[in-house]
UniProtKB/Swiss-Prot annotation:
It comes from Sulfurihydrogenibium sp. (strain YO3AOP1). It is a multi-pass membrane protein. Pathway: Protein modification; lipoprotein biosynthesis (signal peptide cleavage). This is Lipoprotein signal peptidase. InterPro entries: Peptidase_A8. Its main location: membrane. The active site is at residues 121, 139. The gene is lspA.
Length: 163
């Protein structure tokens, strides 16, 4: 197997393990209490999220919500993995990293949705009474992966091709 494919699989695996481990710890230790980490800015608090990242689609009808969320997680994982396996020799290290972050995060949340019917979120950032929706390692991984991929495609790839 190609080095880039192995890197992709390794990073994806680490994200999945990190995500599921932190969610299990959150479920175990935060079930009945929140822990203030940085007063006025950051808490650890268990939130059961039936929606997508940052609570999106939480109010959608259950059947539609489940189909969209499970389907989108499967599609994201399959597309990112397929893209890496098909064009691995042409991918930059940053592209491999960004796609692995997206894939690993998608699989982590897919596990929760499939096995638990909802996702365990626990990272709560806020300023005063204004809270950002709670999220987890998978959500952060997907968001960072998408940002890196878009940034690479818009800014860095052009420079790489012209040099």
């Amino acid at each position: 197997m190609n080095k880039k494919v192995l890197t992709f699989l390794g990073i994806s695996f680490v994200i999945i393990v990190l995500d599921l481990t932190t969610k299990s710890l959150a479920e175990k230790y935060l079930a009945d209490k929140a822990i203030e980490i940085i007063p006025g800015l950051f808490n650890l608090v268990l939130v059961w999220n039936k929606g997508a990242a940052f609570g999106m689609l939480a109010e959608a009808p259950e059947t539609i919500r489940k189909l969209m969320l499970v389907g989108s997680s499967i599609i994201a994982a399959v597309i990112t993995a397929g893209y890496v396996f098909k064009s691995n020799a042409k991918l930059s290290n940053l592209e491999v990293l960004s796609l692995a972050l997206i894939c690993g995060g998608s699989v982590g949340n897919l596990y929760d949705r499939f096995m638990l019917g909802q996702v365990r979120d626990f990272l709560d950032f806020y300023i005063n009474d204004h809270h950002w929706p709670a999220f987890n390692v998978a959500d952060a991984s997907i968001t960072i992966g998408i940002a890196l991929f878009i940034g690479y495609e818009l800014f860095w790839k052009k420079r790489r091709i012209t040099n």
